[in-house]
Amino acid sequence: MAKTAILSNGNLNIGLNEFGLVSDFYFPDNGYENHTLGRDLFHRIGIKIGDEFSWLQNGDWQFSSEYFEDALISKTEAINNNLQIKITFTDFVVSDFDVFARKIRVQNLANYPREVQLFLHQNFAINSSFHLADTVQFLPLEDDEKAILHYRGKRAFIISAQKVGGDFNQKSFKDFDQHTVGLFGIEGKLGSWCDAEDGILSSSNVEHGQTDSVLGFNFSLGVFESADFQYSISCADDHQLALTNFQKMRDEGFSKALSETKKSWQKWLAPALRFSKKLDLKYQKKFIQSLMLVKSHLAKTGAPIASNDSEMLNYARDDYSYCWPRDALFAIWPLIRLGYRDEPQRFFTFCKNSLTPGGFMMHKYLPNGELGPSWHPYSQGGETRNLPIQIDESAGILFLFAQYYKKFRDNSILDEFYDDLVKPIADFLVDFCGENNLPKPNYELWEMDFLSTTYSTSVVFAALYSASNLAQQLNRARDAKKWRDQALKIRTSAQNELFNPENNYFYRGIWPNGEKDSKIDASSFYGAFIFNLFDFKGEKLHRAFNVLEKRFNVDSQIGLPRFESDVYYRFSDDYEANIWPITTLWRAEFYIARGEILKAKEILDWVSDQQTSTGILPEQIDPRDLKHLSVAPLTWSQAEYVSALLDLIASEE
């Protein structure tokens, strides 16, 4: 199920699916331990009127979604014309404590009064696992308050729901009328949600195993009348803290939490809003939405998570809830350009703590810094040995740190990270270059092949050249000379070895046997351009760009694929490859650099049109029908959109 909104405070991350239902539930860290596990494990919402019952996902509802202006607070409208009912959700994750909250309004669209029932269902696989039993209990609390507790060990989720009555001056709050708890996925049980369909919940008070629960409200609606409800899930790794958070949200605490969350986002967005005002009006909203989506994927450790969309678990063995240093470069870079200091600095601390003793980053990481799973082997077969790494990931971190220093000129930060991050990586990159002065074969940007690519060479060049400038700032003359000398050797060798005069494009790379790969790969051009491996004023970059556009027929299709014959998520042989927003935006960035703003805006407009109403961009787009493919949102796609618009602002200034 594609995501329509992401809500997060860095600890708690909620993904809402196309029906506005909770389908990803990460806690206590962004991207780590999804307690709904994707797949069919989502929280249901149902309405019963008379003899008719409808769950929101059953196909009878029409949906629209949007974010609040300048806050990661979503609004979803669901209309059922057959039932003549509308439900409006206002959803948010509280900014300063770990609660998912939603305001619910149920409106009668009929010109006659109705008796209505609202059912709110939740299920969890706590700690992302079915291996051990969860417990669910009905909680009868003091002062006639009621709640539902789901827990495993210390981890607790407390669910509360109230009907809101009264007027503006004196509101009243009434807890749910019905409840039940039960099992799903074992012993032939589908789930306690089935119990709601007859309108009467069985009031079961405890269960353990694979557990779920349902809350129910019974209420009347006059002609065109509405009823309001508030619902929350309070989360903690301590049962008492979960109760404390639950109490904070009771009664008037809900409105306060919504107000404070909105203020918190507006404060964080203040630097970005100043930039957005310099854009054409048509880009401003999408710019801010994309930036909020990037922020929503930053773990509390500082690690940018590639995507928290777990939909692909329906088809694949794993998801994207990891930190790839490759993606992190492009996620953090626009934050630096916008003037954000804290998030990049936390990420550099994450990198310093994750860096191997050899001075390189591994393939990918869990949000807490532990090593993530990898498909890169230590050997290419036979007696060969190699590191299971992508050299661009280590180089990218070094380049990014140099951009941070260039922006803020903070010598205390340079002192803090020089010996533990800058120098180890730079020395490793020098040692990793072969006799031809290019990086030795390694796993390339797209994580598939083992060779020395133009893209990786570009990042290593830029990283070493930037590192030499950092060394000069600290009067480390020996380091500065060593790193600059190697950078210049790389550039000279690249000029001789990596441009293919036969097709006027960059070689994708050089294989371990010395053979050169002529495949047209968008990253070869982009790396040479953005990391200044080839002179922007020279002919080769511009000739290569023309070849890239002609090869992928941009006159009839604005979007670019990654490379020729890309089969990843390609579901038919009747077309060559899917479109990637990332590579498409690279086209726009080059046009901006050339001063061809109208052409750049044509591309930016096309990418903007592919965004959802909440600004979400996927990893890939089917060129036949423009449907989103793979994960959505992809943090890199959102960040690249922000970066392209920042380029546009810079060009027009």
Regions of interest found by a model, annotated:
Residues 1-81, 157-195, 260-286:
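An extended acidic
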Residues 65, 114, 219-239:
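Short Pro-Gly-centered flexible turn/kink motifs
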Residues 89-92, 203-206, 215-221:
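Beta-strand-rich interaction surfaces with strong enrichment in secreted/lumenal proteins
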